[in-house]
Amino acid sequence: VYKTMYQHKVPEFLNNIIVLDGDVKNPDQGWNNYPHNKNFAFLPTMLAPERMIYEMLFGMDETDEFWDNSLSGYSKDVCFRDYPNQLSEIDDIKDWFEGQKDNAGRSYSKFLKEWKKRNPHEVEKFVQEFIRAYDYVAVKTGFETLGDEEQ
């Protein structure tokens, strides 16, 4: 959908901030020749968000402070009980991710907060990219910018 709107230069699409998953930038998994439009921002890494979270959690030791290893807590074993082997296919990872909804917090906030804590540099890069996209759209549409520079 985004690719079609971009190619047809739909005004609403060009005058808004568009945030796409990071895997769009990965030529092996995403949108080859992705647009370099100034109103675009991409989520951190070149992975689908579900894969990014999956890899973080799967790579954690079961004694990591993230896990609540009490009897009724959310442990690594609970997280991966239906998927004990490492997943590689994105559809399987998305199914796993959907199954974590009850333990992940509102809008998966528990997972996202942990990822942000472990990846401050990636978070800062995303914030700067988002501000750049916002400022570009703000100048085009007559709003005040957030950054220090005019676009």
Roles of regions detected by a PLM:
Residues 1-151:
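Acidic, Mg2+-coordinating catalytic modules of nucleic-acid enzymes
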